[in-house]
Amino acid sequence: MAGKVPTPHIGAQYGEVADRVIMAGDPLRAKFMAENFLENPVQYNNVRGMLGYTGTYKGKRVSVQGHGMGIPSIGIYTYELFNFYDVKRIIRCGSAGAFHPDLKLGDVVFGMGSCTDSNYGAQFNLPGTFAPIADFELLRAAANKAEELGIGYKVGNILASDVFYGDDAESWKQWQKMGVLAVEMEATALYMNAARAGKSALCICTISDSLVHGTACSAEERQTSFTNMMKIAFDII
């Protein structure tokens, strides 16, 4: 179902967005990807400062788009892309905080599944609990590409949390006990919107801080230095 464009959040006309989109929470990271990976990028969106560009990468038409922070924000952008712009696949390139002691700053994590403390799924009125998971073909391609490029990675469950500054500073350890690798704030909505629309999605994260070791990347590093996951995303999209 294509239509209802431009939307309140994306200023593009139908056809200006490619059917393959790589997303980032920070719109400046989207701009960085457009300037460093795309040939002949054309900006199609600056509504609310959430930058979007379309260009080509190795002969493929690809768009990059910011989505903001949190499940409600990515929920809006991915819904509109999947349902109004007829996007077929979305890969999120994001940052995450490590729960696993072996994960170091800059390591790459592929979110095979997305746990959450959000009630985003309640809207679907399901008679049970839905398990939001990545598209297997994208996940397999990402792992294979990481092997090919010699990039270290882990695959497993991640947590999409509604809370950045939690009142209980130790609650993450309960997720750690269940083998959850890392925390971010968006993958559940991405995966559920993809499932509902019959489309494909994958969340790739770079570790920007560690709750285990108390280390963190700078804001500048978060914006520009996560190139390994970007290489993977562009090669498999």
Locate predicted features:
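Generic non-transmembrane alpha-helical segments
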Residues: 141-149, 193, 232-236
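Expand to "…catalyze enediolate/carbanion chemistry for C-C bond making/breaking, isomerization
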Residues: 83, 167, 196, 204, ...
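His/Asp/Glu-rich mid-to-C-terminal helical/loop segments that flank catalytic regions of hydrolases
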Residues: 211-237
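Metabolite-binding pocket within alpha/beta catalytic cores that recognizes anionic/polar moieties
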Residues: 1-140
